[in-house]
Amino acid sequence: MKKGFSLPLWVAGAARSALKKLVGLPFDNYELIKIPNEKKEIKIEIHSVGLLKDDSHALGISFAKSGLYLDITQNLEIWTIASLERNSFNNPLQTNPINIIAGSGVGIKEDTSEICISDFAKEVLYENLLDIIPEGFNLKLEIIFPNGVFLAERTSNKSFGIVDGLSIIGTSAETYSSASPDQLEEAKTNLAKLVQNDFKGKVVFVIGENGLNLAKNCNLKFPILKVGNWIGPLIVDAAIKKVKTVILFGYHGKLIKLAGGIFHTHNHLADGRIEILVYLAVQEKVPTEIIVQLSHLKNLEEALLLLERFDKSIAEKLFLNLSNTIEKRSFTYVNRYVKTDMEIASIIFDRKREIRWAGTYGNKYISDFQ
């Protein structure tokens, strides 16, 4: 499979090139980007760089190459505008030498208006820019994705309270397809490492960057494994490795697929989310006219809002049933391949990243996530 590099590296490459131009260093058609806490550098191609506004600003441009055909950021055009600001006389040792600003097409958090950028992305920027900033100055770095607003409409960003563009996420330098067998093998290798030495028998499986970031913020006492879309085979692998408890932690829009017996959750392979919700609504004896409305909705968040407007108690009961169904269907799935009494727990969060529901087993651990 063709390898690529995550969005933070391409942003850092464009930013480093712009800053070098601003301080008078020569242009190169690539930048060697250092990876935090790793002894390696990655060559990032730079498209162009130039000075703006009477040479007080510099623009660096790169095009992301994630190596993933279906990835939304493949060939994404990235602009970074660098400018320098003198340290304040009253505060010569400012604690934030780099001010990262969300320009057009870059996602911000709806509730705080802060730029949506991962800790890894910030670390990559700091690692590769601090050594070029002249003494006595701070760097103002505006990041722009010219096509970001349009592309964001094809993501679930709004479901997580991210608006106005694409978020700058990523927790590692290299990328791989979430539907690729390579990802499954890497996740199985990581699971094998987790269950060694002082492993206590319980592990948290998360899907996607939002789930991973939220789980890390919970300061869990359990190890966390990002499983991508190969969740079914990895639950089976956990049973083979004699794991005692797997806690499935994720957004309802992904985990609902398990309730319908879909154990590879990539949307390009199978969807069925609304259909599964309609089935659960029938079980809860939701009126026919509401079920018809549900069947025509585009996503699960719209369905949840419709159900809550109709009857909050029924909506809550339905999603609790969803949590229990996820646990039961997952246990049945695993036992097709390996006989096990491994406990499978489900804990689900909503678009506001609030932990809302848990199954029978998930309730035993939900306090650890709050």
UniProtKB/Swiss-Prot annotation:
Class of this enzyme:
transferase
UniProt EC number: 2.1.1.195
Q: Name one GO biological process term.
A: methylation
The metabolic or biological pathway listed in the UniProt record of this protein is:
Cofactor biosynthesis; adenosylcobalamin biosynthesis; cob(II)yrinate a,c-diamide from sirohydrochlorin (anaerobic route): step 6/10
**Recorded GO MF terms:** cobalt-precorrin-5B C1-methyltransferase activity
Keywords (A to Z) from UniProt: Cobalamin biosynthesis, Methyltransferase, S-adenosyl-L-methionine, Transferase
Could you tell me what reaction this enzyme catalyses? Co-precorrin-5B + S-adenosyl-L-methionine = Co-precorrin-6A + S-adenosyl-L-homocysteine
The UniProt entry, under Pfam families, shows: CbiD (PF01888)
Q: Which family does the similarity line name?
A: Belongs to the CbiD family.
This protein's name: Cobalt-precorrin-5B C(1)-methyltransferase
Q: Which gene encodes it?
A: cbiD
